[in-house]
């Protein structure tokens, strides 16, 4: 299972996973967009190995419903959870808020994934350790992988916008205060759009 396959790392991870023999569950806000983007680089045969499930990670109720659907359909098949989806809006003047009132990048990039992992962890742990990839049976330990990109990379959007956003988790006061308005950042300080936490 991989979140965020409409562009970048997530989209470019589909082909190697499928080529290695994996069947993939792709989680995105829009199945239509995810399918359209995947169709540009994958054959119909490859697309048939992807199950698209629509979940908006910023909405924790949708995450719960989506995790239930995943657990029902793929309980014994879930081997890897790749947390890749993210939002990054460095030009915002004030924070966007999720349905539950959390700062949106915190909701998508962290809280939604955290909840998804917690809801699916038992399925991962209890899945069969023997898998068949490209005709070979191998032993496999289920795993969770969390991806992130460096926003200071000048080749990426974040690196082209001169917004100082040094890493600063402080004492994690944002967690203590629940990220509800006016708190947006993990450190509990004033909103900085160039930070994804």
Could you describe each region identified by the protein language model?
Residues 1-197:
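Rossmann-fold NAD(P)H-dependent dehydrogenase/reductase core
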